[in-house]
Amino acid sequence: MDKLYTPNPDGYCGDEDNGQTSAWYVFSALGFYPVAPGSGQFVLGAPLFRSAKIHLENGKTVTIEAPDNSDTNRYVEDLDVDGKPYNLNYVTYDQLTSGATLKYDMGSTPNLTRGTADESKPYSFSRSADVPKVKAKKSRK
């Protein structure tokens, strides 16, 4: 994100797609993105900033804190949501619109155990267990 998107005339790579590219960038820079619209979930990633606030129309505020975030500390070690340990890999629309506080503990190496349980996974259009098996058709030869 810090190499392909810059504040220059050629700062967006590729086609802007009617604002979709910049919307992706803003969400991703905040540390979450609505991968499956309509699911009510925002998949978590690593925020670009150490601190950000989103003031919502309903008067609530979404606060994102990642005080140790840096070029070397780019991995999510742990996450607290509203002051409690949080092991899911997504937040919900309802959480955000209620004025959530996301506090990221960032580190220099990936945490390979956080968010690995099945219940931690976000909604998917095609989980491997849900994908029907397709039988190969016999060749006409």
Predicted regions and their residues:
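Non-catalytic C-terminal accessory modules of carbohydrate-active enzymes
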Residues: M1-K141
